[in-house]
Amino acid sequence: MAEKLPTEFDVVIIGTGLPESILAAACSRSGQRVLHVDSRSYYGGNWASFSFTGLQSWLKDYQQNHDSEEGVTATWQDLIHETEEAISLRKKDETIQHTEVFCYASQDVEDSVQDTETLQRSSPLEASATPADSLDSASLPKERQSAYSTSYEVPSRHTEESDRELSLPSANVEDSLEKEKYCGDKTDMHTVSGEDKGEHKLVVQDSIEQPKRNRITYSQMVKESRRFNIDLVSKPLYSQGSLIDLLIKSNVSRYAEFKNVTRILAFWEGKVEQVPCSRADVFNSKELSMVEKRMLMKFLTFCLDYEQHSDEYQDFKQCSFSDYLKTKKLTPNLQHFILHSIAMTSESSCTTLDGLQATKNFLQCLGRFGNTPFIFPLYGHGEIPQCFCRMCAVFGGVYCLRHKVQCLVVDKDSGRCKGIIDAFGQRISANYFIVEDSYLPKETCSNVQYKQISRAVLITDQSILKTDSDQQISILVVPPLEPGTTSVRVMELCSSTMTCMKDSYLVHLTCSSSKTAREDLEPVVKQLFIPEAEAEAGKDELRKPRLLWALYFNMRDSSGVSRSSYCGLPSNVYICSGPDWGLGSEHAVKQAETLFQEIFPSEEFCPPPPNPEDIIFEAEG
């Protein structure tokens, strides 16, 4: 460690996920001295995004379950006084399970002899990436290993040109985050390591047309690794949602850039169709008859102020939204569009009131930035936690990645947490402690019942619904394919989102888990895509996009866990959960705001920063 950290802070935050990062920004903005640490080598925790080879290295790190104690210079037990006790923090992250990787893309020997030799050294079902120690971290502030930083430089990226930009408040900014370097990977299929450069900003852009794509090989994906920014959890943002409102209010929006989600799709009678969202879309639709257009507009108009017409749904409050739609004399395809593509809810678990509220929310978000209710961050959702970390650092927050915390120090008499002891044996005191739940020891979580999220990440060669433009960002909810299964949310990203290489698409699939991720999601993958080898052999419809690469994994969902479920927590220790499986990031924002108001009830949550022109300096002397 190059130099020691200060020994006293107001707030210590462990973990750099979205809720922790929002809290760090809010605390720092209100004048608190903040220390924000993470044992990982990258920002975001389970909200992070990775390059192609970086993701594979991350997978290897999980499978190897590294628990090294490098750099430990003192035994923490010796630093605990007689009047104190310690809560030892977990050293191994166990929130990701059942990782499986499949590579369907061909190996192009001419592209890279060296890459091919590396692949051939591995077995066809298991290959390992470049060793973790040869890869660095993707960290927002560039920093020395375990050294702390009070400055916050942001990754400098040079985006490709776009036709036109529409900003939430945005500005060009410098970047110090090298987005490409991560740690270790060992998975079920081909994995290698190679990298390239990226870029940064915060704006909503229109689509760009690009020339027809060529065949993509695995070697090309490795060479273009840094063109990929692959989210562990990928969520669109409601244009009128609480996260966008917070980004604008706090002026954190200037650190990021967005694009409109251009299409809402539906999976109906075995094919993918585009769903009309706005009034103009409805009446221009060729999929709906004139009678259906009138029926749809009448129902959507009712949903906008459904609270004023409670007599319309009073008798159906306890019914499912699906059953309620059947009473409105809507055709089956309209019911399907409303349930799965507008309300985006479950057929079985969504009540009438929840469905009406979801539909109203969808409609209220239309038109703010584009023709759909959603926008998506360039470079992936992993950018958002980094933006809030940057704001924290701007107001004096201290950041330190690769910095393990061994334990919380608790005063026996008061029951309050007094400080932490890090992996270097340094004791750091604070008034409040915010901890990501993955760091909590098993004893503390013994009564907790977690849910699971099933995730799949795919790289494909074309869109699931081809149009004149190949730069479409699409959201599709696939209804349950069999009784007892759940609906699956599909998000398809084009290369202009800066999340994948040119001529490819990055596809995210998400659902609540009932089995392993592969068991939950593979039926949907088979419905929408065809592995490249089968396409070459002509074994399936050539109209389907070719599947080049796939990753499946399960992620823990702790969003529904209440504080009372944790055992023996000191009163001044607050817990943040990981991502939930729902649409948007409203839960993370609400959690951060609730905890902030609990800790600092008299302070405003993330107020706008002062305008430099309004700052008055007192004359000296």
Swiss-Prot record:
Task: Supply the alphabetized keyword list.
Answer: Cytoplasm, GTPase activation
> Record's Gene Ontology CC terms?
cytosol; Rab-protein geranylgeranyltransferase complex
InterPro entries xrefs? FAD/NAD-bd_sf (IPR036188), GDP_dissociation_inhibitor (IPR018203), Rab_escort (IPR001738), RAE1_2_domI_C (IPR054420)
Q: Where is the composition biased (Polar residues)?
A: 115-125
The family this protein is said to belong to:
Belongs to the Rab GDI family.
Q: Which GO MF terms are attached to this record?
A: GDP-dissociation inhibitor activity; GTPase activator activity; small GTPase binding
Q: What organism does this protein naturally occur in? A: Mus musculus
Which gene name belongs to this protein?
Answer: Chml
Chain segments carrying region Disordered: 113-171
Q: Subunit structure, per the record?
A: Monomer. Heterotrimer composed of RABGGTA, RABGGTB and CHML; within this trimer, RABGGTA and RABGGTB form the catalytic component B, while CHML (component A) mediates Rab protein binding. Interacts with RAB1A, RAB7A and RAB27A, but has much lower affinity for RAB1A, RAB7A and RAB27A than CHM. Interacts with the non-phosphorylated forms of RAB3A, RAB3B, RAB3C, RAB3D, RAB5B, RAB5C, RAB8A, RAB8B, RAB10, RAB12, RAB35, and RAB43.
Tell me, what does this protein do in biology? Substrate-binding subunit (component A) of the Rab geranylgeranyltransferase (GGTase) complex. Binds unprenylated Rab proteins and presents the substrate peptide to the catalytic component B. The component A is thought to be regenerated by transferring its prenylated Rab back to the donor membrane. Less effective than CHM in supporting prenylation of Rab3 family.
GO BP annotations listed: intracellular protein transport; protein geranylgeranylation; small GTPase-mediated signal transduction
Q: Where in the cell is it found?
A: Cytoplasm, Cytosol
Report biased composition (Basic and acidic residues) as residue ranges: 155-166
What protein does this entry describe? Rab proteins geranylgeranyltransferase component A 2
